[in-house]
């Protein structure tokens, strides 16, 4: 058995060699990233990383050290990518827009009286020209075709969580988030004038409206729930039906607009019910007072990649507000990740943090930088 002092002397000598090799390796990493920048190549290349790991593991003489060696190599590459990310140019275009178009046309899902219409007025002001569309995707198509300048769509409810369709659609169409607003949601039961609750056999509302009112509906289980495209559309449908066995769950404004009678206010499960809406645009707009960044990214399908990304965010000292995952349709059990964090893209530290995130992801896109609601 070797003497402890002698072991430490030999370890110190090896560490010295490692530091010399470390400096050489990092110098080569710098050359690699400079080449990739000049030739417009992706910084992260999962196939190359797998090749490096396997090639080095095959060089081991002691198979019992294989998993330790794997961790060592992966950590070495993580450090290399972090260094490379610091060498990337900062990408914010100084000519990027900071102001919205004057007198815009804004699209939303639903009809007059919808919560989405209230969100339009909250963000752009009363009197803004707005157009309602039947489905969420119709708003994206209208924006794509130039029928509208911006769209306002729900992204999250404080009770029922994310509206996943809009996470998927903003990725599908490649649009940007340029703002957000929140609307207090008061779900109300309404029907034709003179109707009593015990007369009702069907209730119509958007699936979110039904979900948010689940406790009330459980108490009235004899009423059949009928999902509808929109809460305000449901109110209009009930009025047009002239059927006193039908009711809608919608906003007080919809009740007033469509001449229905309010049977019960605030039937939602919790009174503090709010929906957050995003404002979408075909082009990126970063108002100077922005304090929230949204990004979407994918990761190599390897152990520890999500943890590495979260560590990158932590080490960059940025406060993450939210993380959401959505399946990649063409790849089993792999995901798109959406995160929101505090910051302004005009700050150098935020741009450098995003560069580090890019170095740890397969793909990454900034969805927007805007003022939080």
Where do the language-model regions lie?
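Domain-level signature for soluble enzymes in the chorismate/prephenate branch of the shikimate pathway
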Residues: 1-373
């Amino acid at each position: 058995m070797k003497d402890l002092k002698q072991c430490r002397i030999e370890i110190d000598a090896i560490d010295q060699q490692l530091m010399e090799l470390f400096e050489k390796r990092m110098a080569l990493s710098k050359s690699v990233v400079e080449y990739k920048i000049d030739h417009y190549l992706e910084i992260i290349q999962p196939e190359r990383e797998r090749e490096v790991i396997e090639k080095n593991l095959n060089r081991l003489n002691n198979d019992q050290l294989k998993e330790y060696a794997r961790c060592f190599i992966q950590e070495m590459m993580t450090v290399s990518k972090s260094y490379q990310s610091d060498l990337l140019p900062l990408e914010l275009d100084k000519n990027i827009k900071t102001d919205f178009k004057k007198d815009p046309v804004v699209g939303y899902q639903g009809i007059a009286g919808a919560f989405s219409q209230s969100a339009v007025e909250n963000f752009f002001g009363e009197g803004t020209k707005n157009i309602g569309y039947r489905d969420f995707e119709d708003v994206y198509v209208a924006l794509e075709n130039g029928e509208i300048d911006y769209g306002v769509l729900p992204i999250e409810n404080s009770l029922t969580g994310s509206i996943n369709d809009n996470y998927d659609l903003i990725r599908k169409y490649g649009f940007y988030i340029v703002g957000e607003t929140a609307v207090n949601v008061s779900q109300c039961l309404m029907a034709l004038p003179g109707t009593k609750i015990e007369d009702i056999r069907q209730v119509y509302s958007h699936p979110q409206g039904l979900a948010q009112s689940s406790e009330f509906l459980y108490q009235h289980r004899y009423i059949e729930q009928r999902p509808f495209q929109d809460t305000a559309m449901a109110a209009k449908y009930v009025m047009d039906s002239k059927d006193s066995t039908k009711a809608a769950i919608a906003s007080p404004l919809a009740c007033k607009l469509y001449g229905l009678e309010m049977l019960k206010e605030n039937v939602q499960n919790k009174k503090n019910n709010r929906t957050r809406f995003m404002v979408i645009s075909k082009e990126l707009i970063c108002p100077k007072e922005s304090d929230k960044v949204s990004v979407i990214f994918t990761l190599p399908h390897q152990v520890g990649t999500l943890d590495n990304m979260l560590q990158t965010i932590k080490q960059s000292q940025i406060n993450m507000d939210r993380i959401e995952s959505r399946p990649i349709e063409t790849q089993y059990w792999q995901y798109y990740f959406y995160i929101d964090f505090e910051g302004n893209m005009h700050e150098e530290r935020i741009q450098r943090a995003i560069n580090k995130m890019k170095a740890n992801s397969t793909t990454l896109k900034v969805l927007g930088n805007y003022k939080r609601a």
